[in-house]
Amino acid sequence: MSIQLPPPIALYVQLENAGDTETLSACFAPNAIVRDEGQTYEGLAAITAWKAETKKKYHHTVTPLDVAQQHGKTVLTATLTGDFPGSPVTVNFAFVLEAGKILSLEIHA
């Protein structure tokens, strides 16, 4: 069974798995916020730097398992596989979308 992801999330997963950290910023609104590993990244420059750093450090890929609407967010449950202890892990990506872009993303294991 194939999972139907909203276009900005589908593009995020595609670019994430391709390691295209520069183009990945095109998925986000200019004022987007990302929360990951206890840190907050605000704006496209910070998000691009965060993604480049995490990709270099973990060499990870995302495999979607499920998607659901919860409390106004689109929550993608996925397997995250990479060079980190405990890999693979199941992770929730909680997206808020606006005007075809990612306005916020919170990542929780």
Label for each model-derived stretch:
Residues 12, 23-24, 32, 43, ...:
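Hydrophobic pocket/interface hotspot
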Residues 34, 67-69, 107:
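Hydrophobic/anchoring residues in structured secondary elements
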Residues 28, 70, 98-99:
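Structural motif
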Residues 8, 18-31, 35:
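Short, well-ordered alpha-helical segments enriched in acidic and aromatic residues
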Residues 33-42, 57:
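A short gly/proline-enriched turn/hairpin at secondary-structure junctions
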Residues 90-109:
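Short beta-strand edge/turn micro-motifs at domain boundaries
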Residues 51-92:
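Surface-exposed, charged secondary-structure patches
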